[in-house]
Regions:
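Alpha-helical bundle regulatory/interaction domains
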Residues: 1-162, 166-175, 181-185, 199, ...
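Alpha-helical DNA-contacting segments of helix-turn-helix folds
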Residues: 159-160, 164-166, 191-216, 242, ...
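Flexible, glycine/small-residue-enriched loop-and-beta-strand segment within the central core
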Residues: 220
Protein backbone atom coordinates (compact mmCIF):
# COMPACT_ATOMS: atom_id res chain seq x y z
CA UNK A 1 0.00 0.00 0.00
CA UNK A 2 1.32 3.45 -0.95
CA UNK A 3 -0.01 6.65 0.61
CA UNK A 4 1.44 10.04 -0.36
CA UNK A 5 1.76 12.62 2.39
CA UNK A 6 1.44 16.23 1.22
CA UNK A 7 2.74 19.33 2.98
CA UNK A 8 0.87 22.63 2.65
CA UNK A 9 2.03 25.16 0.08
CA UNK A 10 0.66 28.08 2.09
CA UNK A 11 3.22 29.56 4.49
CA UNK A 12 0.41 30.26 6.97
CA UNK A 13 -0.73 26.64 6.94
CA UNK A 14 2.81 25.25 7.17
CA UNK A 15 3.15 26.95 10.54
CA UNK A 16 0.25 24.96 11.98
CA UNK A 17 -0.34 21.95 9.70
CA UNK A 18 2.23 19.18 9.33
CA UNK A 19 0.51 17.74 6.26
CA UNK A 20 -2.32 15.59 4.94
CA UNK A 21 -3.08 12.52 2.85
CA UNK A 22 -5.96 11.16 0.77
CA UNK A 23 -7.42 7.67 0.37
CA UNK A 24 -10.19 6.53 -1.95
CA UNK A 25 -12.31 3.51 -2.83
CA UNK A 26 -10.79 2.99 -6.29
CA UNK A 27 -9.38 -0.52 -6.34
CA UNK A 28 -7.49 -1.73 -3.31
CA UNK A 29 -8.15 -4.50 -0.85
CA UNK A 30 -8.95 -4.66 2.86
CA UNK A 31 -5.88 -3.84 4.91
CA UNK A 32 -4.78 -2.92 8.41
CA UNK A 33 -1.83 -1.29 10.09
CA UNK A 34 -0.55 -0.08 13.43
CA UNK A 35 0.20 3.58 13.96
CA UNK A 36 2.26 4.81 16.88
CA UNK A 37 1.94 7.65 19.40
CA UNK A 38 2.66 11.14 18.15
CA UNK A 39 1.98 14.70 19.28
CA UNK A 40 -0.13 15.70 16.30
CA UNK A 41 -3.85 16.38 16.45
CA UNK A 42 -5.27 14.29 13.61
CA UNK A 43 -8.60 14.97 11.89
CA UNK A 44 -10.06 12.49 9.39
CA UNK A 45 -12.97 13.28 7.08
CA UNK A 46 -14.77 10.20 5.72
CA UNK A 47 -17.47 9.82 3.09
CA UNK A 48 -19.98 6.96 3.05
CA UNK A 49 -18.09 5.16 5.79
CA UNK A 50 -18.71 3.74 9.23
CA UNK A 51 -16.13 4.16 11.98
CA UNK A 52 -15.96 2.32 15.29
CA UNK A 53 -13.27 3.42 17.76
CA UNK A 54 -12.27 1.52 20.89
CA UNK A 55 -9.38 2.05 23.27
CA UNK A 56 -6.70 0.64 20.97
CA UNK A 57 -8.45 0.03 17.65
CA UNK A 58 -10.28 1.91 14.88
CA UNK A 59 -12.34 -0.09 12.36
CA UNK A 60 -13.54 1.47 9.11
CA UNK A 61 -15.98 0.03 6.60
CA UNK A 62 -18.20 1.27 3.79
CA UNK A 63 -21.58 2.49 4.92
CA UNK A 64 -24.87 1.38 3.41
CA UNK A 65 -25.99 5.00 3.66
CA UNK A 66 -24.77 8.23 2.12
CA UNK A 67 -23.10 10.31 4.84
CA UNK A 68 -19.99 12.20 5.90
CA UNK A 69 -18.28 12.12 9.26
CA UNK A 70 -15.23 13.59 10.97
CA UNK A 71 -13.08 11.97 13.64
CA UNK A 72 -10.44 13.39 15.95
CA UNK A 73 -7.35 11.55 17.19
CA UNK A 74 -5.05 13.34 19.60
CA UNK A 75 -4.06 10.93 22.35
CA UNK A 76 -3.00 7.29 22.35
CA UNK A 77 -0.09 6.00 24.39
CA UNK A 78 0.40 2.57 22.78
CA UNK A 79 0.04 1.36 19.17
CA UNK A 80 -3.35 2.02 17.58
CA UNK A 81 -4.58 -0.71 15.25
CA UNK A 82 -6.42 0.69 12.22
CA UNK A 83 -8.52 -1.78 10.21
CA UNK A 84 -10.05 -1.04 6.81
CA UNK A 85 -12.63 -3.73 6.05
CA UNK A 86 -13.00 -2.04 2.68
CA UNK A 87 -11.22 1.00 1.24
CA UNK A 88 -13.07 4.25 1.95
CA UNK A 89 -12.92 7.86 0.79
CA UNK A 90 -10.81 9.72 3.35
CA UNK A 91 -8.93 12.95 3.91
CA UNK A 92 -6.67 13.03 6.97
CA UNK A 93 -5.01 16.20 8.27
CA UNK A 94 -2.12 16.32 10.76
CA UNK A 95 -2.17 19.49 12.88
CA UNK A 96 0.93 20.47 14.85
CA UNK A 97 0.67 20.93 18.63
CA UNK A 98 -1.77 23.79 19.29
CA UNK A 99 -2.21 24.04 15.51
CA UNK A 100 -5.85 22.98 15.31
CA UNK A 101 -6.75 25.75 17.78
CA UNK A 102 -6.05 28.25 14.98
CA UNK A 103 -8.92 26.75 12.95
CA UNK A 104 -11.40 25.79 15.68
CA UNK A 105 -12.45 28.28 18.35
CA UNK A 106 -12.69 26.80 21.85
CA UNK A 107 -10.87 23.63 20.79
CA UNK A 108 -10.24 22.76 24.45
CA UNK A 109 -13.82 21.49 24.84
CA UNK A 110 -13.19 18.78 22.24
CA UNK A 111 -10.10 17.34 23.91
CA UNK A 112 -12.10 14.62 25.66
CA UNK A 113 -12.46 10.92 24.79
CA UNK A 114 -16.07 11.47 23.74
CA UNK A 115 -15.01 13.75 20.87
CA UNK A 116 -12.89 11.25 18.98
CA UNK A 117 -15.46 9.35 16.91
CA UNK A 118 -17.61 12.36 16.04
CA UNK A 119 -15.88 15.70 15.64
CA UNK A 120 -18.22 18.50 14.53
CA UNK A 121 -16.85 21.80 15.88
CA UNK A 122 -19.10 23.97 13.68
CA UNK A 123 -21.53 23.32 10.77
CA UNK A 124 -19.23 24.38 7.93
CA UNK A 125 -16.29 22.29 9.11
CA UNK A 126 -17.51 18.91 7.96
CA UNK A 127 -19.56 20.10 4.96
CA UNK A 128 -16.76 22.19 3.41
CA UNK A 129 -14.12 19.50 3.89
CA UNK A 130 -16.32 16.66 2.62
CA UNK A 131 -17.10 18.69 -0.51
CA UNK A 132 -13.50 18.09 -1.58
CA UNK A 133 -14.42 14.46 -2.38
CA UNK A 134 -16.45 15.73 -5.36
CA UNK A 135 -13.32 17.13 -7.03
CA UNK A 136 -11.73 14.67 -9.45
CA UNK A 137 -8.11 15.83 -9.74
CA UNK A 138 -5.71 15.47 -6.82
CA UNK A 139 -3.99 18.82 -7.44
CA UNK A 140 -7.37 20.56 -7.38
CA UNK A 141 -8.32 18.69 -4.20
CA UNK A 142 -5.14 19.93 -2.52
CA UNK A 143 -5.79 23.53 -3.59
CA UNK A 144 -9.35 23.35 -2.35
CA UNK A 145 -8.29 21.80 0.98
CA UNK A 146 -5.87 24.65 1.58
CA UNK A 147 -8.55 27.19 0.62
CA UNK A 148 -10.99 25.65 3.10
CA UNK A 149 -8.44 25.60 5.92
CA UNK A 150 -7.44 29.21 5.26
CA UNK A 151 -11.12 30.13 5.37
CA UNK A 152 -11.32 28.62 8.87
CA UNK A 153 -8.06 30.24 10.01
CA UNK A 154 -8.04 32.72 12.89
CA UNK A 155 -4.74 33.07 14.70
CA UNK A 156 -4.95 32.55 18.45
CA UNK A 157 -1.69 33.29 20.22
CA UNK A 158 -0.64 31.72 23.51
CA UNK A 159 2.88 32.86 24.33
CA UNK A 160 2.94 30.90 27.58
CA UNK A 161 2.12 27.63 25.80
CA UNK A 162 4.58 28.46 23.01
CA UNK A 163 7.31 28.74 25.62
CA UNK A 164 6.36 25.40 27.18
CA UNK A 165 6.38 23.67 23.79
CA UNK A 166 9.73 25.21 22.90
CA UNK A 167 11.31 23.99 26.14
CA UNK A 168 9.84 20.52 25.66
CA UNK A 169 11.28 20.47 22.15
CA UNK A 170 14.69 21.06 23.75
CA UNK A 171 14.03 18.14 26.14
CA UNK A 172 14.02 20.38 29.22
CA UNK A 173 12.66 18.61 32.30
CA UNK A 174 9.23 19.48 33.68
CA UNK A 175 10.80 20.64 36.93
CA UNK A 176 13.14 23.00 35.07
CA UNK A 177 10.30 24.33 32.89
CA UNK A 178 8.25 25.21 35.97
CA UNK A 179 11.29 26.96 37.47
CA UNK A 180 12.05 28.96 34.31
CA UNK A 181 8.43 30.02 33.85
CA UNK A 182 7.98 30.70 37.57
CA UNK A 183 4.85 28.58 38.00
CA UNK A 184 4.11 25.47 40.05
CA UNK A 185 4.41 22.05 38.46
CA UNK A 186 0.74 21.47 39.23
CA UNK A 187 -0.38 24.61 37.39
CA UNK A 188 1.97 23.87 34.52
CA UNK A 189 0.58 20.35 34.12
CA UNK A 190 -3.05 21.43 34.36
CA UNK A 191 -2.63 24.23 31.84
CA UNK A 192 -0.79 22.01 29.38
CA UNK A 193 -3.37 19.24 29.55
CA UNK A 194 -6.20 21.74 29.07
CA UNK A 195 -4.61 23.09 25.89
CA UNK A 196 -3.01 19.97 24.40
CA UNK A 197 -5.16 17.17 25.80
CA UNK A 198 -2.35 15.07 27.28
CA UNK A 199 0.03 15.24 30.21
CA UNK A 200 3.48 16.78 30.06
CA UNK A 201 5.12 13.40 30.72
CA UNK A 202 3.16 11.76 27.88
CA UNK A 203 4.08 14.55 25.50
CA UNK A 204 7.74 14.46 26.47
CA UNK A 205 8.02 10.68 26.15
CA UNK A 206 6.31 10.76 22.76
CA UNK A 207 8.53 13.62 21.57
CA UNK A 208 11.63 11.59 22.43
CA UNK A 209 10.20 8.61 20.55
CA UNK A 210 9.47 10.70 17.43
CA UNK A 211 12.96 12.20 17.53
CA UNK A 212 14.39 8.68 17.63
CA UNK A 213 12.48 7.83 14.47
CA UNK A 214 13.70 10.94 12.68
CA UNK A 215 17.31 10.34 13.69
CA UNK A 216 17.21 6.78 12.35
CA UNK A 217 15.41 7.81 9.18
CA UNK A 218 17.82 10.66 8.43
CA UNK A 219 20.90 8.57 9.17
CA UNK A 220 22.03 10.95 11.93
CA UNK A 221 22.14 7.98 14.31
CA UNK A 222 23.67 4.79 12.94
CA UNK A 223 23.01 2.43 15.83
CA UNK A 224 21.01 2.18 19.04
CA UNK A 225 23.91 3.37 21.19
CA UNK A 226 24.07 6.65 19.26
CA UNK A 227 20.30 6.88 19.37
CA UNK A 228 20.34 6.47 23.15
CA UNK A 229 22.69 9.36 23.80
CA UNK A 230 21.28 11.63 21.07
CA UNK A 231 17.99 11.46 23.00
CA UNK A 232 19.70 12.19 26.36
CA UNK A 233 19.03 8.76 27.88
CA UNK A 234 21.43 7.58 30.56
CA UNK A 235 21.80 4.13 29.05
CA UNK A 236 20.48 1.86 26.33
CA UNK A 237 18.30 -0.20 28.68
CA UNK A 238 16.40 2.96 29.71
CA UNK A 239 15.95 3.87 26.05
CA UNK A 240 14.75 0.36 25.14
CA UNK A 241 12.29 0.32 28.05
CA UNK A 242 10.67 3.62 26.99
CA UNK A 243 10.67 2.56 23.34
CA UNK A 244 8.95 -0.74 24.10
CA UNK A 245 6.37 1.02 26.31
CA UNK A 246 5.25 3.00 23.25
CA UNK A 247 5.58 0.40 20.49
CA UNK A 248 5.23 -2.98 22.26
CA UNK A 249 8.36 -3.92 20.29
CA UNK A 250 12.09 -3.76 20.89
CA UNK A 251 13.86 -1.01 18.90
CA UNK A 252 15.52 -3.62 16.68
CA UNK A 253 12.24 -5.36 15.86
CA UNK A 254 10.41 -2.08 15.34
CA UNK A 255 12.89 -0.64 12.82
CA UNK A 256 13.00 -3.96 10.97
CA UNK A 257 9.22 -4.07 10.44
CA UNK A 258 8.00 -0.48 10.30
CA UNK A 259 7.21 1.45 7.11
CA UNK A 260 7.46 5.21 6.71
CA UNK A 261 4.63 7.50 5.65
CA UNK A 262 6.86 10.57 5.24
CA UNK A 263 6.08 12.29 8.58
CA UNK A 264 4.53 9.28 10.29
CA UNK A 265 5.34 5.61 10.57
CA UNK A 266 3.04 2.61 10.15
CA UNK A 267 3.48 -1.07 10.71
CA UNK A 268 1.53 -2.79 7.94
CA UNK A 269 -0.09 -6.08 8.96
Amino acid sequence: MSVKFYQPKSSILRKYVEGFYFMNTDGGQPFEYYTFPNNFCIVSVLRNADLVISQDEAVLSRSLFSKELCSLTYRYRTPLRVVYKEPVDEITIYFKPFGIHQFVKGMERFLTPESTASFDPFPEFRSHLSGIFDIGERTEQICRLEEVLLGFFEERKDLFLDEILSLLEDDVSVEEISRQLNVSRQYLGQYFKLKIGKTLSEYRLTERFRKSLQLMKSGSAHNFTELTYENLYFDQSHFSKDFKAITNLSPKEFFRRAQWLDHNVWLIV
